[in-house]
Amino acid sequence: MNTAYRVWDGENMHYGDDVNLTLFIRDKVWTLYKDSAGLCPDIVASSQDGKSVLMWGTGLKDKSLYDGDIVKYGTFNYQNGVICYDTHQATFKIVPVLFYLENAGNGGWTGNSIRKTVPLKVIGDVYQNPELLEGAE
């Protein structure tokens, strides 16, 4: 199974389909390695380094969406939202920015189903574009 993922290492975004990257997961600890010309792989990022974040793709084949993406969505009154995984309902949702900021990652999200929300466009992510979250209060 080829699952879409990406990793923010605190400075750069690395995608699962980048050349020579391998993601290793054991229990809840993960490490992203890069193979350098057949030598010992270099550690690119890890769940234990205190700055890196692993984000899974939503699995929707017609949309390239990842946990943490900031999207503009709606039909007439466009607004910004954040793609979040709701651990209580086991699904990805589009969470309005204000709700995202208030919840601060507690796992249960009030938001909209991605499948029912059209159209939407990725305009950034919470790590590389935090300024897109400003002004929502």
Predicted features, each with a name:
Residues M1-E137:
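Secondary-structure transition motif
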